[in-house]
Swiss-Prot record:
Molecular function GO terms recorded: alkanesulfonate monooxygenase activity
Protein name listed in UniProt: Alkanesulfonate monooxygenase
CDD domains on file: Alkanesulfonate_monoxygenase
First-level EC class: oxidoreductase
InterPro entries per record: Alkanesulphonate_mOase_FMN-dep, Luciferase-like_dom, Luciferase-like_sf, SsuD_RutA_monooxygenase
Family: Belongs to the SsuD family.
Origin species: Pseudomonas putida (strain GB-1)
Length: 382
């Protein structure tokens, strides 16, 4: 099976070490462009652009990198409750047209109550998933060209529609990750690709089986992906030494403060990540070659595959055998590590190389709109 391999744009910061300003690297637009162009040339299929108050806006970053890349796809965040589903559908179609069909969308419900309150979203975990289901139902139908009336518990729209369609038909794919039962129900009903963070294979297999069963009950099939860091070197010894260096400047106080901050999250996935290491820097290899050191201070994806090229490839194939076809990787610093992954890991995998887009994007295919929603007539129709 050919694998889709994505990289990551560190819009929240980058560096050689975790939890310290030593070795930190300024992340400006030029640096993000370097990483995006490297990923494009090295054969990565796309890049995940993170979202949240610690990150630059993923949509603006993606739009700014369209002109300087050729094949690379951009996986950007949809934020239910933060924006209307109709407006989000218009934005999605525009990004897809401007990128010539290189837009992908990642549904993010949020997990930090403090951040969500700051964004004006005052819903609990269950309510957010209710709102996300309503959002996604509307977003999908609008992008697929339907006129939508919807009267939900959290969202109501009347006459929602899209005048300029996306390049990808019937619409760009929707990605989503979540570990709670409500999240799995949403994935089974609404998304094309279900993402998990890098838990041990046995735990990932259990989640895949649960989502598959729920999707089958609705007559659907869902693809699967996984989000992991990678520390790959020419030898296993060098790789493990690099892992140790990555957290070599972390002190107990920094770890304690990071874990206290992450503990307020109501995300089940974040809780599962934290349980892998328990805030303890001892015994961080939680499964063969799966290292939880990143999660000591980082929210979200907190594990890395560590080893030489053949060893990491063997672990990737273990996940692939579970049904995963998409791997979203990252590494510190992200520019150099993109080359290491491509040079040391890709030769041991069947990597699906992205194709050059064949059709041109457009803004308006039929001239200027009349009034607000009337298509202009040709002379022969007059």
């Amino acid at each position: 099976m050919s694998l889709n391999i994505f990289w990551f744009l560190p819009t929240h910061g980058d560096g050689k070490y975790l939890g310290t300003s030593d070795g930190a690297r300024a992340v400006d637009h030029g640096y993000l462009q370097q990483i995006a162009q490297a990923a494009d040339r090295l054969g990565f299929g796309g890049v995940l652009i993170p979202t949240g108050r610690s990150c630059e806006d993923s949509w603006l970053v993606a739009a700014s990198l369209i002109p300087v890349t050729q094949r690379l796809k951009f996986l950007v965040a949809l934020r239910p409750g933060i924006i209307s589903p109709t407006v989000a559908a218009r934005q999605a179609a525009t990004l897809d047209r401007l990128s010539n069909g290189r837009a992908l969308f990642n549904l993010v419900t949020g997990g930090d109550p403090d951040e969500l309150a700051g964004d004006g979203l005052h819903l609990n975990h269950q309510e957010r998933y209710e709102a996300s289901v309503e959002f996604t139902r509307i977003w999908r139908k609008v992008l697929e060209g339907e006129n939508v009336d919807y009267d939900g518990k959290h969202i109501q729209v009347k006459g929602a529609k899209l005048l300029y369609p996306p390049i990808q038909q019937p619409r760009p794919p929707l990605y989503f990750g979540g570990s709670s039962e409500a999240a799995q129900d949403l994935a089974a009903e609404q998304v094309e690709l279900y993402l998990t963070w890098g838990e041990p294979p046995s735990a990932v297999a259990e989640k895949i089986a649960q989502v598959r069963e729920k999707a089958a009950a609705q007559g659907r099939e869902v693809r699967f992906g996984i989000r992991l860091h990678v520390i790959v070197r020419e030898t296993n010894e060098e790789a493990w030494a690099a892992a140790d260096r990555l957290i070599s400047h972390l002190d107990d106080d920094t770890i304690s403060r990071a874990q206290a901050s992450l503990a307020r999250f109501d995300s089940v996935g974040q809780q599962r990540m934290a349980a892998l290491h328990g805030g303890n820097r001892d015994n961080l290899e939680v499964s063969p070659n799966l290292w939880a050191g990143v999660g000591l201070v980082r929210g979200g994806a907190g594990t890395a595959l560590v080893g030489d090229g053949p060893t990491v490839a063997a672990r990737v194939k273990e996940y692939a055998e579970l049904g995963i076809d998409t791997f979203i990787f990252s590494g510190y610093p992200h520019l150099e590590e993109s080359y290491r992954v491509a040079e040391l890991l890709f030769p041991h995998l069947d990597v699906q190389r992205p194709e050059q887009p064949k059709t041109g994007g457009y803004v308006s295919p039929f001239g200027e709109m009349v009034a607000n929603d009337i298509l202009p007539k040709s002379v022969s129709q007059s």
